[in-house]
């Protein structure tokens, strides 16, 4: 049976225009028609299941670009990671993907979880055993010996070892590769202000990942780490915090490198919402506390990058302390209210731009005939008030109705 979604307006993800009185027709797992409600035929309506949302907005499903689905998102998340069993991680992961889907995330990229967890979970979602978003996985992140996330990462120091680690993840079925190019605040004893790999090692990693058809995302806080990643041709920078090697200087923003990021088409996931949520939830020291020690300066840097043409994508770092799996809507909210871009620009980052970063823009990211039927109906108008994204009324993921008129069906 066909499915017809009707709402007061539509944001298709590819245009800055809002289309009034819109309808989306879905057949199986695919969008077959996008039109005004007046263009729907009597036969289409008679043969279809119709969901009509007065006051609502049709838009593409959210794309969460940065998650760790085996992590707890609780205040003692690091303790959980270092003490729990793979069986517990699987249970946490199954809850995480369900929670994400229930909040409107229809595509989710995991950027570092145990191989024994993410690959079985991806298969379970694909086979319909458990509900979840389309799950794209890196498996274990690649890090140096004792480096950031070493407790669940693959430790590799030389170019040869890093390339071997990439090939192993490819053999297991990874959708992309994650490498820790600098230290991180979540892992005790690592240095967020210093690189873990030189640019030649990263270059060799990128070259082999590209040979295998895989894109590479790099965790980077230190400015020197950012420089190394850009020089090496990393596809996606995660955090991109521009931290100075001198703690007293805090940031060491390099506009020339920002221009190179824009020119090379490198996507940036600034994980903006994590510190915002820590502040809301009363935690002062955060995994990225160094990156947001001066939030106004951080947002000033990001605004400058935006104006230079850098493309931003939407990652929560969900699973890390206080970053819950149903928190996605805070990302575009912070992009609008703190970074200063428009609601429509933030929505495009969360849909179309993120799909392009994944190399899946022929399949997801916009409401276009022929693409996957990943469609939300928002109660309200997020093009005017971005906070409306918290009010997801209806969710369709790959043609299946997950939530209808506020009622969760999974």
Predicted ranges, named:
Residues 211, 286, 295-381:
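His/Asp/Glu-enriched, well-ordered alpha-helical/loop segment
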Residues 8, 12, 350-352, 356, ...:
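C-terminal cap of metal-dependent C-N hydrolases
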Residues 187-297, 313, 318-320, 340, ...:
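Active-site core of metal-dependent hydrolases
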């Amino acid at each position: 049976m066909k499915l017809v979604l009707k709402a007061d307006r539509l944001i298709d993800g590819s245009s800055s225009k809002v289309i009034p009185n819109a309808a989306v027709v879905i057949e199986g797992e695919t969008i077959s028609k996008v039109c005004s409600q007046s263009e729907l035929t009597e036969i289409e309506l008679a043969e279809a299941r119709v969901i009509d949302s007065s006051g609502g907005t049709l838009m593409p499903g959210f794309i969460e670009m940065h998650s760790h689905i085996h992590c707890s998102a609780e205040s003692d998340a690091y303790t959980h990671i270092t003490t729990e069993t793979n069986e517990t991680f699987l249970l946490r992961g199954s809850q995480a993907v369900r929670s994400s889907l229930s909040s409107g995330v229809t595509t989710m990229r995991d950027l570092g979880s145990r191989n024994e967890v993410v690959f079985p979970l991806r298969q379970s979602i694909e086979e319909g055993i458990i509900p979840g978003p389309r799950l794209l996985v890196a498996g274990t992140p690649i890090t140096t010996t004792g480096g950031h996330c070493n407790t669940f990462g693959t430790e590799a120091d030389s170019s040869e070892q890093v390339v071997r680690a990439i090939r192993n993840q490819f053999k297991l079925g990874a959708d992309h590769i994650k490498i820790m190019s600098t230290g991180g605040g979540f892992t005790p004893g690592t240095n967020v202000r210093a690189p873990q790999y030189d640019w030649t090692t990263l270059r060799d990693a990128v070259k082999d990942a590209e040979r295998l058809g895989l894109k590479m995302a790099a965790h980077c806080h230190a400015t020197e780490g950012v420089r190394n990643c850009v020089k090496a041709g990393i596809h996606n920078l995660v955090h991109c915090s521009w931290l100075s090697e001198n703690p007293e200087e805090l940031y060491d923003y390099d506009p020339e490198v920002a221009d190179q990021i824009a020119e090379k088409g490198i996507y940036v996931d600034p994980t903006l919402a994590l510190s915002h949520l820590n502040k809301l939830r009363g935690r002062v020291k955060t995994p990225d506390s160094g990156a947001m020690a001066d939030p106004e300066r951080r947002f000033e840097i990001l605004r400058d990058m935006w104006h230079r043409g850098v493309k931003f994508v939407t990652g929560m770092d969900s699973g890390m302390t206080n970053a819950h799996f149903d928190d996605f809507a805070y990302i575009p909210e912070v992009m609008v209210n703190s970074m200063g871009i428009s609601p429509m620009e933030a929505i495009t980052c969360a849909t179309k731009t993120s799909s392009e970063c994944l190399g899946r823009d022929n399949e997801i990211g916009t409401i276009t005939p022929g693409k996957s039927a990943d469609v939300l109906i928002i109660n309200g108008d997020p093009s005017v008030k971005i906070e409306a994204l918290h009010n997801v009324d209806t969710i369709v993921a790959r043609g299946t109705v997950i939530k209808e008129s506020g009622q969760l069906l999974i």
